[in-house]
Amino acid sequence: MPSQSANSETTGVTSDAVALWEIVSVVTSALIAEWVVLSFVRQSKLIAAIPILMALGLMLWSHRERGETWRDLGFRKDNFVSACRLLLLPTAAALLVIIVAGWLTNASLLAGNFRSRFLWLPLWALFQQFALNGFINRRAQLAFGKGAKSILLVGIVFSLLHLPNPLLAVVTLLGGFIWAAAYQRQPNLFALALSHSVVSITMALTVSPNLFNSLRVGFKYFG
C-alpha cells in the first residue's frame, strides 16, 4: 500500500510538472515571435509565424495525448448563453471604462477608423482564447486546480505577452483574470471570443491610438 501511494504521488508530481512545462513552452514560442524573430526580420510575418505554428503543434499534440475533445476545450454551443451571462456585466463595465477613458483623453467617439482587419478580429480573438484558456488555463488547472492560483497564472501569462506596453499589460491582466474565471465556470470559447472582440474593437475605435501605442507589443512597441 505505501508503495502504491508513493507511485500515485510521483505520478501526480510528474503530471503537474509536464503541464507547467507545456505552458512555458507555448509562452516561450510566443515571446520568441514577438521579440526575437521580429527584431531581425521585421518585414516577414511568415517567418514570425514559425514559432507560433510550433506552439500550435504542441498544443494540438497535447490535447490529443490527453484525450481532450474540441467540446472539452470549449468549442461548444450548449453553454453559450450561460457563458455570455457570466461575461455580460464585466464586459459592459470594461466598455464603460474604455469609453470614459477615450472621452477623458479628448479622443473623439470614433478615434480610429473602422478597418477591414476588424472583420477578422473575432477569429483572432477566438484563437487567442483557445490558446489562453483552452490550453493554458486547462494546464494551469492540472497543476494548481481550479480557482485563484490557476486564474492568476492565466492573467499573468496574458499580460506578459502584451509587454512592454504598460497600459495594455494592465488591461490584459484584468481581462485575463475575468476570462479565465468565466472559462472555469462555463468553458465556452465562442463566448470568450465575443467578449474579447467587442472590447478590442471598442478600444480601437474610441481610445486614442497614442494611449496604447496603437496596441503594439513586443519588439514592434519600439517602432
Annotate each predicted stretch with a short phrase.
Residues 38, 141, 183-184:
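Helix-capping/transition residues at the boundaries of transmembrane alpha-helices
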Residues 5-28, 52-53, 67-95, 112, ...:
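Interfacial transmembrane-helix boundary/kink motif in multi-pass membrane proteins
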Residues 42-51, 109-115, 166-173:
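Short, aromatic-rich membrane-interface segments at the entry and exit
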